[in-house]
Amino acid sequence: MEPGCDEFLPPPECPVFEPSWAEFQDPLGYIAKIRPIAEKSGICKIRPPADWQPPFAVEVDNFRFTPRVQRLNELEAQTRVKLNYLDQIAKFWEIQGSSLKIPNVERKILDLYSLSKIVIEEGGYEAICKDRRWARVAQRLHYPPGKNIGSLLRSHYERIIYPYEMFQSGANHVQCNTHPFDNEVKDKEYKPHSIPLRQSVQPSKFSSYSRRAKRLQPDPEPTEEDIEKHPELKKLQIYGPGPKMMGLGLMAKDKDKTVHKKVTCPPTVTVKDEQSGGGNVSSTLLKQHLSLEPCTKTTMQLRKNHSSAQFIDSYICQVCSRGDEDDKLLFCDGCDDNYHIFCLLPPLPEIPRGIWRCPKCILAECKQPPEAFGFEQATQEYSLQSFGEMADSFKSDYFNMPVHMVPTELVEKEFWRLVSSIEEDVTVEYGADIHSKEFGSGFPVSNSKQNLSPEEKEYATSGWNLNVMPVLDQSVLCHINADISGMKVPWLYVGMVFSAFCWHIEDHWSYSINYLHWGEPKTWYGVPSLAAEHLEEVMKMLTPELFDSQPDLLHQLVTLMNPNTLMSHGVPVVRTNQCAGEFVITFPRAYHSGFNQGYNFAEAVNFCTADWLPAGRQCIEHYRRLRRYCVFSHEELICKMAAFPETLDLNLAVAVHKEMFIMVQEERRLRKALLEKGVTEAEREAFELLPDDERQCIKCKTTCFLSALACYDCPDGLVCLSHINDLCKCSSSRQYLRYRYTLDELPTMLHKLKIRAESFDTWANKVRVALEVEDGRKRSFEELRALESEARERRFPNSELLQRLKNCLSEVEACIAQVLGLVSGQVARMDTPQLTLTELRVLLEQMGSLPCAMHQIGDVKDVLEQVEAYQAEAREALATLPSSPGLLRSLLERGQQLGVEVPEAHQLQQQVEQAQWLDEVKQALAPSAHRGSLVIMQGLLVMGAKIASSPSVDKARAELQELLTIAERWEEKAHFCLEARQKHPPATLEAIIRETENIPVHLPNIQALKEALTKAQAWIADVDEIQNGDHYPCLDDLEGLVAVGRDLPVGLEELRQLELQVLTAHSWREKASKTFLKKNSCYTLLEVLCPCADAGSDSTKRSRWMEKALGLYQCDTELLGLSAQDLRDPGSVIVAFKEGEQKEKEGILQLRRTNSAKPSPLAPSLMASSPTSICVCGQVPAGVGVLQCDLCQDWFHGQCVSVPHLLTSPKPSLTSSPLLAWWEWDTKFLCPLCMRSRRPRLETILALLVALQRLPVRLPEGEALQCLTERAIGWQDRARKALASEDVTALLRQLAELRQQLQAKPRPEEASVYTSATACDPIREGSGNNISKVQGLLENGDSVTSPENMAPGKGSDLELLSSLLPQLTGPVLELPEAIRAPLEELMMEGDLLEVTLDENHSIWQLLQAGQPPDLDRIRTLLELEKFEHQGSRTRSRALERRRRRQKVDQGRNVENLVQQELQSKRARSSGIMSQVGREEEHYQEKADRENMFLTPSTDHSPFLKGNQNSLQHKDSGSSAACPSLMPLLQLSYSDEQQL
């Protein structure tokens, strides 16, 4: 096939062998075993056992090498021929001043070489043109038909190839006095393995790569359409070939150069009357060229016509020998000869431009011998790491995928495509033939400097170690002393993708073995030795151009050829992929090649076995014909092995004897011929001491050893006896024989070999007589062992006779071991298998038939007699059944002592086992307190299935099976009751337990069911007890009962009721928590509702707050100082709550005294020794921005706590004069340590109490809430009495009058607002006694910034308040100490309450009016409010922008989907809530029917009934949806109303 025309088809796979560990121990023996199969393929692959994994011993850090450079398309033979052809034709045109540009046809570069070959095969240019077969040429070049490509090919052929072909044919070499080069093949120097490189041919000094690359750059070629459209192109198409065809691919280098050389006139001009040399050109083409008009363009100048005849006669055409028509006479720039343009072949239509050379000069230039092809070394030195990085990067970039993901099939097809392509130049590098002796072997080596581990020592001595295999005893190379690199010393190979090794056979046609240490696979191709000559013939036939210049091309490892091409010509080829850890073996004269799939590391070496010797001799004769150097002397190797025959392996000795015999016969014949020639002189020569180059035949380059012919007069050379006529021309009397051994010494050596070879026959005869007992005498065991030892010591081959001897010895040893066991009683042990009676008789017969005399046969006969006697006794005992169990057991023990298995002993064993099993069944089923388990019963049943059947055994087995089935069924039912999701009522469990009481088996699930039923009954009793008690059950008790009930696998009706009660109680507590607790509060609900137990300890309160900041929440379970049991008594709870109130009041008074004694943070300086306040943040509050708690009198940072807001009144009032009523401003500050909850209003708490009354559960929080409510109402009553006293009422009237004075001159637009605002104020009346104190405020009110000038918004309000601060004066009331003290005490007690009451606010305003305004606090609050206002504005802007973006992004469809989802969720939520509501109503109705109140001793009914009327007196103008409790709590300070 043509390379590259078809897709690559992989050849069949070579044989693959996987030896066992036993076979793997003998490498060369195993190779000899598989040789008949593997040799037919040429190569084979061996996979070692999986555990054989030698360590990689190369020192990676010190490993440096320089690889070879391989250009892939120069490796393939046919591609190289094409490239050489392109070089030659390019050189042809370059000499004539034109550069070659290869045209493109159908978007592919035109294959000029194939076109030339096909034209020649089709009969030549003239014949194809005559028959118009250019379309056939296009078809053979695989171009599609119907596109007129044939005419285009003809144009290219005429323009580029035809002039070169005419030149090559010699048609235009008329009268050219040129002498052809000597074609005699010179001796090609072959470097033996001691030379570093196998590829001895050096690369060309001048790389043709750049020239080829330039040629392959496509230029636009004229198509057929262009030729038809442009007449000038059509005219140029029929021109003859030549360098004048510029623009069609052949361009002159110097367009403007004019060549005109003048030749001196010779003294004599001889005109020869000869015929023109152009007669062999077709007349049609010649006429066509002669009929063309000369070109009118600027061309080379012709010689001018001179009037002198001398000048006319001096210009003579070298072809026609005429000087006429000198205007068409062309002058050569190389030799100064003259030619008519029409005398040239082919003729030229005009004088060409630029430099022109005649055919003689072109011939001289083109006939220079080509330079030999070889590999060049890379310029960069690599380490293993750097080379691997380069290789992996190249492969991944080339295939555009990770290296490990590239299929091997893809790499293989791409490789053969690249080597066959003249268009793509891919260059790779290959670290080949790296000396392991210099760089280190990949296998561990024993003589290395490093200390080897035991594992490494094992691999260092293994026969498969490539450093060991060539020097094994069975190997021939172990008898060569020199370390031949590559043959005895391994070579290393570091490959990358596409790096290749070309077709070759090993030196001396030896074996080779290659091991891939690691890396990606290596692809191999192999050809068997029988087809080696056929492969050489095919390659020479397909590429004769290469072999004409290099006959030994295949020995240089530089040439590839596509396996498909070889297979198409009948060469059998196989392939394989060698993976890491695998061996590949090549057999003698088996051609092989291949390439690497990627980055890998391999090691290879040669070895020679006994069967190689004939092939080695044939190889020497082949080398002699090719005149190739030998690596070693084959004769020397044979003689060296023959000199020490006892050290040879027997197979090797036999093979050496045969080779030695043939060599001696040939030596006698050659010496006889030398004697007949007349050479009589001779002298002994120790050839092995001479260097190889001093004992090589000057004719055939063979290394001489046995003999050589030399000459006294020509001492510089010698010849082998096969070329005695090629030494010199001297007389035979001057020639003499140089010999190593005489003809008498050679037969002696041959005889010693024969003895060694025939020693095996002598030994084999002895073994045959012993094994077949031919003399009638059996040999002893020691005699047979001596024969086997002799074979091992003398290293006889592993023959069939030796195997028979080994088998016989093995049988004898086995018989002796069995006999010793019988006699000594060793087999009586239970772990030793016993012989049967039949086997004992067979053993006796075997011992008698073996060819070995054994005295143990008498012992075997005695044992056989004892066994037969025992057998008779056992039969008698079995015949008299039922016998006593003791007798049977004693007979059984005696039989076991014999060491032989008797059939009757088996029956005795069965009887004993049956009796034992029946006893165990009776004991298990006997009524007793301890019942057997199911496992025991199942074990008995399994044992009963194994023993032999009998009526009693069958009956017991049936009863046991029935009992087990019943027990398992009830166990399954009990398991279902325990594990089922739907729990069963106690009645069902009691029924199951009653049914299983009569089963005599311990049932674990039934027992678990009993325990569960007992627990359920106890749980029901606890529920009844707690439900029937004096009080409602506590929530903790119910939760504990629910948790226990849920874990019980019993269906309990009371559990659902308890779960609902617990759920309702949790719901109430959650609602109460939301009402009281702040977000992320550090207090529990119970702590908030109870009096503060640590009110007097400032450190305790602050530690509580720090625990909240750190997330350390703790629950105080003894807030009231009561145990869990005491909390169940409502009376104890009330008493403890009262005591807690008193402790809280005492504690806060102590804390106020302590904090009041601390220096104020607003003071200019603080004493270091005095105690200071600590804020909740842990720092000391100081400077501006600190606030003092009105309850505990401690100081805090304003930014660390929640502060009151001054702007709490409606906005219209802020722009009017009543703003000066500073005592009504919300400046009261309670720290987070004092204000622990949200402090809901009293009406909210009363709603929680109403819900609590419906709960049939007691909660500690409910008790605490009831106490808190009673405490709050009690305080409210005392506060109302205090506010209703005459003195306080008078003070309240003064404040009311003062407010009226401040509201006297409102703005017109604010009048309506003030009217509504003052109507709702509870402080409406006052006294005129202190009107003068606020007169200044009224007068200065006109100077206040007018509302019109204030910007709207909260910022303007804060500015207004700030502007009013200088105008605030006070106090506005005079509070006597008798009034102030009770009010302050009431204020303190009200602040302790976690409830919001209006009376608290009224008392606060009264106390504020009776003292000067706290300007520092007001300024601090204003600054904090401004800071908060700025942050809120920034957040509001960002929020507004985010909302706008969301509105733009949201679509109508999304809104619909959201609405649908919300509706579905509401529907589900309403369904769930309605279900819960119905359940709550059900249980509430039940509770109402049973008159279940909160507690008998503490009833909410009187308290709630007392406020029932106030709930009904709701303001008729109120728009609230729920009943209001404000009429109950609100105070009226008018004269018409009473408190």
Curated annotation (Swiss-Prot):
The keyword Repeat applies. Expression is highly down-regulated in metastatic prostate tumors. Residues 192-228, 1429-1521 are annotated as: Disordered. Keywords: Chromatin regulator, Dioxygenase, Iron, Isopeptide bond, Metal-binding, Nucleus, Oxidoreductase, Phosphoprotein, Repeat, Transcription, Transcription regulation, Ubl conjugation, Zinc, Zinc-finger. A zinc finger (C5HC2) spans 697-749. Residues 79-169 form the ARID domain. Fe cation binds at H504, E506, H592. Residues 1432-1446 have a biased composition (Basic residues). It is an enzyme of class 1 (oxidoreductase). Residues 1477-1491 have a biased composition (Basic and acidic residues). Binds 1 Fe(2+) ion per subunit. Residues 197-210, 1494-1521 have a biased composition (Polar residues). It is found in: Nucleus. Residues 14-55 form the JmjN domain. GO terms for biological process: chromatin remodeling; regulation of androgen receptor signaling pathway; regulation of DNA-templated transcription; T cell antigen processing and presentation. PROSITE patterns: ARID (PS51011), JMJC (PS51184), JMJN (PS51183), ZF_PHD_1 (PS01359), ZF_PHD_2 (PS50016). There is a cross-link at K205, K229, K244, K272 (Glycyl lysine isopeptide (Lys-Gly) (interchain with G-Cter in SUMO2)). The JmjC domain is required for enzymatic activity. Belongs to the JARID1 histone demethylase family. Involved in sensitivity to docetaxel. Histone demethylase that specifically demethylates 'Lys-4' of histone H3, thereby playing a central role in histone code. Does not demethylate histone H3 'Lys-9', H3 'Lys-27', H3 'Lys-36', H3 'Lys-79' or H4 'Lys-20'. Demethylates trimethylated and dimethylated but not monomethylated H3 'Lys-4'. May play a role in spermatogenesis. Involved in transcriptional repression of diverse metastasis-associated genes; in this function seems to cooperate with ZMYND8. Suppresses prostate cancer cell invasion. Interacts with PCGF6, MSH5, ZMYND8, AR. This is Lysine-specific demethylase 5D. It comes from Homo sapiens.
